[in-house]
């Protein structure tokens, strides 16, 4: 353990040897010179007297994450480092060092300035004393005007004025000196700026006027008598009682707040004064005044100015009585205008009175609100520090730097472990040997002590072996911090000796830096909650008016929220305004004319990109859209179920129906089939060849689609189905021969969707061929149900089939149909089937979505015009 301590000491010394005895910790001068040559930074060690405490400084690692490390408190060669003042942003040091007595000096200066300029508490007693002195001087100056009290009052006035001059002079000097606590009054220029204030100029004028009066005294010469009149200038000292001009500010604010009302009252009063004075002057100007003997004297209203004087005294309710109207006309005019003018002349007094009362109340409330500033500022500061001490925010280091600069810990110097465990060191043993040659490549390094170079104190008794908990805790904290510092500094240099530096694991009890951060975090949380509680206490209402205002504000906020909620509800459940874009208007020459009741949203020939912009974005519109989609899905499912039912019915048909002996059935069986209304409908069925080669594995790609006719599934049927009429003969002629038979899977599926067209334009006898049966009720219900679906086979072209995502759509060209009243083709030629790879629902324009155009669904066209096509699919 001692070897590791000596190695750490040698590394800290910058090349010191590992020798034992008294020179184990001494630095090598040569090694120190070589290290100093490549390093220009300062070296930090421990100065005498700083051995008991160290400050927590910013980590020296490259990450600069605010790690708390130990740093010595002094310079090299025992020089104490002078703390530099840091600017507000903790970036630029102040140029002047801060003196030790500056804090006390500034505190006294601020205290005097507040007592003189902003008196509170005990300072009010001094200002009350000054007021009594000024009032006494004023009373004695008044008594000197009496002949009987002139001598006595003059003597007392001289003594009191002399005392007042000294008091006011000292106060003025203290004001000039204490003004330096304010930033704008610093220095001699700031003092001159403070002396140029109006109240300071008034103090200077009163002092200058009082000095000659006191110097002359009570002499009876002419000079003394003339100077005594300056004593009444002391009346101006009453103005200095309000140093901050609060009364004048209050009056000015009241006048400014009610300026419009005051101007209105004064304007109407002035008009009343002019009009009443002029009318009284016209009536009374030629009436002479009579004395007691009845002799005529000059007129009382000789000029218009006399009338204005009378009007002002009368309307102001003073009424000296020196001028009065003599005639009844003048008295009537004076009475009429007095009733009007007096009210307007007295109105400004009421306005100012109410305004002053409101301002005083507002000032009291403002003082109450000012009490919230400090708790609010403390809460903001505590909230920020609580946020900044979050361990997950590694980018916030300012708060940790603050704690690094203010938090300090007791320091126990590092020594040989044997000596630390065997005895308690004295004061001299805790003094670090200065090491002027010690250096390190990083410059800023901790230099541990070595007790081998210090003589052991003989006054200390040996202690039992072992460290107590307090020493172990402090030693572990210092050793861990030093080891982390060393590792962070030597990480970039790649020093091979870095692994040997540090201390034994026996003393590394725990990592103190995270523990310290956690403790600071806990303190910040407690302070945040405390300041939050204090701030809530200051939010209590000041008076009933505050309570009413709070309720009013809450009521307005509630109304605004209710209005916002109502707006949201209206937007959710109210459909949007109808929109009619330009591209949805009917064009001339178009194939179809859309009805007016049809929604543009359901127009089949409008692209999705166009309809999405005009869709109703309200919740009700979305509900309607979902409901329509569910309805469309139901129709599609009905269509698929119908297809499946047809397929299953086709497989259940008896095979013997297709042989010639089928017609030789018994009459009883024929009648039974006629009566059976639930027999399956005769459908188109593909027949597999029995004479051909064995069926190969089926694949959709084995049989090209161009080789299969529209009715190719009858190519291998040995039976030629015949029907009555010329159309059946023509249909049989068009059927391909069964000479070349080959095994293939049927490529078409029957559909009952279009059977309604067959029923409409064929008679019952035409539908019932030699191999046909009655239509079952279930099929009839399927026909009735599917006839309402907006599925159309006339509008799907092959381009739509190619871009269909599923490849399963109803395929039939609209050009293949021949519209006419007589479509005498056989029902065998009608293409009531689905081709493989086709569907009716994949293309966007023909997806069932509500009401479709009549031209698209065929509702407005007669059933007799539907004629199938002969073209292959």
Swiss-Prot record:
Residues 11-26 have a biased composition (Gly residues). Pfam families: Ion_trans, KCNQ_channel, KCNQC3-Ank-G_bd. Phosphatidylinositol-4,5-bisphosphate (PIP2) potentiates the activation of KCNQ channels by enhancing the electro-mechanical coupling of the voltage-sensing domain (VSD) and the pore-forming domain (PD). In the closed state of the channel, PIP2 is anchored at the S2-S3 loop; upon channel activation, PIP2 interacts with the S4-S5 linker and is involved in channel gating. Calcium suppresses KCNQ2-KCNQ3 channel currents, with calcium-bound calmodulin inducing a change in channel configuration which leads to the reduction of channel affinity for PIP2 and subsequent current suppression. The gene is Kcnq3. Its main location: membrane. A motif (Selectivity filter) lies at residues 317-322. It comes from Mus musculus (Mouse). GO terms for cellular component: axon initial segment; cell surface; mitochondrion; node of Ranvier; plasma membrane; synapse; voltage-gated potassium channel complex. PANTHER family: POTASSIUM VOLTAGE-GATED CHANNEL SUBFAMILY KQT MEMBER 3 (PTHR47735:SF11), POTASSIUM VOLTAGE-GATED CHANNEL SUBFAMILY KQT MEMBER 4 (PTHR47735). Keywords: Cell membrane, Ion channel, Ion transport, Membrane, Phosphoprotein, Potassium, Potassium channel, Potassium transport, Transmembrane, Transmembrane helix, Transport, Ubl conjugation, Voltage-gated channel. GO terms for molecular function: calmodulin binding; potassium channel activity; voltage-gated monoatomic cation channel activity; voltage-gated monoatomic ion channel activity; voltage-gated potassium channel activity. This is Potassium voltage-gated channel subfamily KQT member 3. Residues 1-121, 177-194, 246-257, 355-873 are cytoplasmic. It is found in: Cell membrane.
